[in-house]
UniProtKB/Swiss-Prot annotation:
Top-rank taxon: Bacteria
UniProt protein name: Porin Omp2b
GO BP: any one term: monoatomic ion transport
Quaternary state and interactors: Homotrimer.
Main location: membrane
Entry's family note: Belongs to the alphaproteobacteria porin family.
Subcellular location(s) of the protein: Cell outer membrane
Length: 362
C-alpha cells in the first residue's frame, strides 16, 4: 500500500463518519414565543392577566406604624408611656367575566405586632404581642358574596368617619362569615340582604370577643340606599338571632362642594345594651357626625363627634397628609367624656389621647 492509497482511504473513512454523525444529529426546536404579562384595566389600576388565562390579578396592601400617647380614649386608662404597633396587610384581588356576571375574589392577611406600656408595671414596662389573621376571604359573583367579610351593618351605610379612633362609641361588630346579595339599580338605588354568622369583637367594652351564632339560625341584615351626585342616604336593619333583638341605623352624606362634605348617622337598638353583636353603643340610641375638608391635593382635615344614650361623648380630629404618593402621615387627637352610666365603668371621667400613623400603601 503506497502513501497515495492510504490518504485516499483515510479521506473516505472521514466522509463516511461525517455522514453517519449528520444522520444522528439532533435538530434544536424553534424557541417558543415568550408570553409577557398583559395589563388588565377592566377592574381598576394594578391588575394584570394571569398568563394563559383571562383572569385578572392584583397584589396590593399597606405597611403601617402607629405611635400612641396619653390616655386610652376607649377605656379611659392612662397609657403610662408610648404604645407602638405595626401591621403589614397583604391583599390579593382577582376578577374575570362569566356568563353569570363578574367573578371576583378578595383576601387580606394581616401581620400585626404591638409593644404597649398600658397597664404594665416594671422597670422596662413593655408588653409585646404579635399575630396573623385572615381578615377577609370572600368570593363574589355578580351581586352574590360569600365568605369572610365585614358586616353589612357597617359596610352598606359607609362605616363612620375618616379618623383612626372612629368607633370609640361602637357601631357594631366588624368581621363575620356571611352570604349576602346586593342589588344595584341604574337609577342610584341599591338594596342588600345578608345572612351573617355574627362578629368577633365588641368595640372593647365588655372584653367579649364572640358574638357569633350558637345554632342554625343566622343573624339577618337588610338595607336600602340612594346615591347621587349630591351625596347619599342609607338605612340598615339587623336582627341578632342570639338575643332575639334588633338594631337599625340611618346615615346621610352631603357633598357641599368638591372639597367639603358632611355626614350624620343615627342608630337605635331594642336591646339597650352594648353587650350584643350590632347595637354596641350605650343605651337605646346613639348619634355620630363628621366632616371632611380636602384643603389641598396632599392634605385633608377630618372631624368626627359621637354621643350615646348612656352619656358617652367622643370627639376626634386629624390631618391626613400625603408626604409623597403612597405615603401618608396622620397626626390625630381624641377626647372622650365618660358621663352618665359610663362614669362608673372607668377610673377617669375624661380621656385625652394622641396618635401618629405612618402608612405606605401600594
Amino acid at each position: 500500500m503506497n502513501i497515495k492509497s492510504l490518504l485516499l482511504g483515510s479521506a473516505a473513512a472521514l466522509v463516511a463518519a461525517s455522514g453517519a454523525q449528520a444522520a444522528d444529529a439532533i435538530v434544536a426546536p424553534e424557541p417558543e414565543a415568550v408570553e409577557y404579562v398583559r395589563v388588565c384595566d377592566a377592574y381598576g389600576a394594578g391588575y394584570f392577566y394571569i398568563p394563559g388565562t383571562e383572569t385578572c390579578l392584583r397584589v396590593h396592601g399597606y405597611v403601617r406604624y402607629d405611635v400612641k400617647g396619653g390616655d386610652d380614649v376607649y377605656s379611659g386608662t392612662d397609657r403610662n408611656g408610648w404604645d407602638k404597633s405595626a401591621r403589614f396587610a397583604l391583599r390579593v384581588s382577582t376578577g374575570s367575566e362569566t356568563e353569570l356576571g363578574t367573578l371576583k375574589t378578595f383576601t387580606e392577611l394581616r401581620f400585626n405586632y404591638a409593644a404597649n406600656n398600658s397597664g404594665v408595671d416594671g422597670k422596662y414596662g413593655n408588653e409585646t404581642s404579635s399575630g396573623t389573621v385572615m381578615e377577609f376571604a370572600y368570593i363574589q359573583l355578580g351581586g352574590l358574596r360569600v365568605g369572610i367579610d365585614e358586616s353589612e351593618f357597617h359596610t352598606f351605610t359607609g362605616y363612620l368617619g375618616d379618623v383612626i379612633n372612629d368607633d370609640v362609641i361602637s357601631a357594631g361588630s366588624y368581621r363575620t362569615g356571611k352570604i349576602s346579595y346586593t342589588f344595584t339599580g341604574g337609577n342610584g338605588f341599591s338594596a342588600v340582604i345578608a345572612l351573617e354568622q355574627g362578629g368577633d369583637n365588641d368595640g372593647g367594652y365588655t372584653g367579649t370577643t364572640n358574638y357569633r351564632i350558637d345554632g342554625y339560625m343566622p343573624d339577618v341584615v337588610g338595607g336600602l340606599k340612594y346615591a347621587g351626585g349630591w351625596g347619599s342616604i342609607a338605612g340598615v336593619v339587623a336582627y341578632d338571632s342570639v338575643i332575639e333583638e334588633w338594631a337599625a341605623k340611618v346615615r346621610g352624606d352631603v357633598n357641599i362642594t368638591d372639597q367639603f362634605s358632611v355626614w350624620l348617622q343615627g342608630a337605635y337598638s331594642s336591646a339597650a345594651t352594648p353587650d350584643q353583636n350590632y347595637g354596641q353603643w350605650g343605651g337605646d340610641w346613639a348619634v355620630w357626625g363628621g366632616l371632611k375638608y380636602q384643603a389641598t391635593q396632599k392634605a385633608a382635615f377630618n372631624l368626627q363627634a359621637a354621643h350615646d344614650d348612656w352619656g358617652k361623648t367622643a370627639v376626634t380630629a386629624n390631618v391626613a397628609y400625603e408626604l409623597v404618593p403612597g405615603f401618608t402621615v396622620t397626626p390625630e387627637v381624641s377626647y372622650t367624656k365618660f358621663g352618665g352610666e359610663w362614669k362608673n365603668t372607668v377610673a377617669e371621667d375624661n380621656a385625652w389621647g394622641g396618635i401618629v400613623r405612618f402608612q405606605r400603601s401600594f
